[in-house]
UniProtKB/Swiss-Prot annotation:
Keyword Transferase in record: yes
Matches recorded under SUPFAM superfamilies: PLP-dependent transferases
InterPro entries: Aminotrans_II_pyridoxalP_BS, Aminotransferase_I/II_large, HisP_aminotrans, PyrdxlP-dep_Trfase, PyrdxlP-dep_Trfase_major, PyrdxlP-dep_Trfase_small
Record NCBIfam families: hisC
The protein's name in its UniProt record: Histidinol-phosphate aminotransferase 2
Modified residues (N6-(pyridoxal phosphate)lysine): 210
Pathway field: Amino-acid biosynthesis; L-histidine biosynthesis; L-histidine from 5-phospho-alpha-D-ribose 1-diphosphate: step 7/9
Cofactor: pyridoxal 5'-phosphate
Catalysed reaction, written as an equation: L-histidinol phosphate + 2-oxoglutarate = 3-(imidazol-4-yl)-2-oxopropyl phosphate + L-glutamate
Family membership: Belongs to the class-II pyridoxal-phosphate-dependent aminotransferase family. Histidinol-phosphate aminotransferase subfamily.
Upper classification of the organism: Bacteria, Pseudomonadati, Pseudomonadota, Gammaproteobacteria, Pasteurellales
Keyword Transmembrane helix: no
EC numbers: 2.6.1.9
Amino acid sequence: MSISQLSRKNVQALTPYQSARRLGGNGDVWLNANEYPTSPDFNLSERIFNRYPEPQPEAVIKGYAAYADVKPENVIVTRGGDESIELLIKGFCEPEDKVLYCPPTYGMYAVSAETLGIATKTVPLTEDFQLDLPEIEKNLAGVKVIFVCSPNNPTGNVLNQADLIRLLDITAGSAIVVVDEAYIEFSPETSMIKQLGNYPHLAIIRTLSKAFALAGLRCGFTLANPELIGVLQKVIAPYPLPVPVSDIAAQALQPQGVAQMKMRVADVLANRAWLIGELKQIPSVVKIFATEANYVLVKFQDGEKVFNALWEKGIILRDQHKAFGLKNCIRISIGTRAELEKTVVALKLA
């Protein structure tokens, strides 16, 4: 018997998540992972590495609580937002329970559920990428955790708050509703943060990977009521954050770090507006989808041809052609103006 045959049956059936980095490429313009295009500069202030780190570093918890305008007991810090997804499934799903998500959306909801042996249900978004509440309500039987993303990855739009509140109303007492706000800094007024006190089954995922320009740090957060946070504390690893990670995260959450983040957001929004203006002039562009994030989803006449043409020129975009309902679509992360100018030139020739 082979080693792979000794693995769990559900693991044998899995396909590894195709992250932007896993897909590879030899490009010099990377616009496929929704990262900030340049790195902030930090110096380590904590240099004691022979001791285990704090399970939940106080400076990071208090810093993020102050930034998000919640209490420290409403916050748990994780190894990126992806660990938050996994913890929520681990903490709340029995083997017979199900996870529901709404494609096209972030792929890790399905991957995490399948890895943990939890079945999934899907209720596709509507044609304008909003929640299909009647269909969701029909499919709630057996569902313990629901993942929604706003701004949604890869479409870029925000979900209607009235729909999110309705979703919370119809799931009270039966399921956890998780709103993934990884990109919320680009549309802060649409956050569900003010609803935490009204809905004890609401959890919000946040990250330092996007607007804070710290994707390499792997630092994320779950915001929720203290009882829900307490459940996650039971299933999280004992020492999730390495000392250098918590050191840099705490610095990034200081007032100066938050101010720098807001400057980055302004830069991204300006470059996004410029890119959209240029895309409108390209004949092969069929549709530019409205976006409130640091990327733009674009439908082309022949998306695969365009993607491959830019790949060969060292410009790496994110092919969404196989995603649900996104045939011929490509997601373009907002890079520097120089990177976007090079991309536009290549798109015109593709």
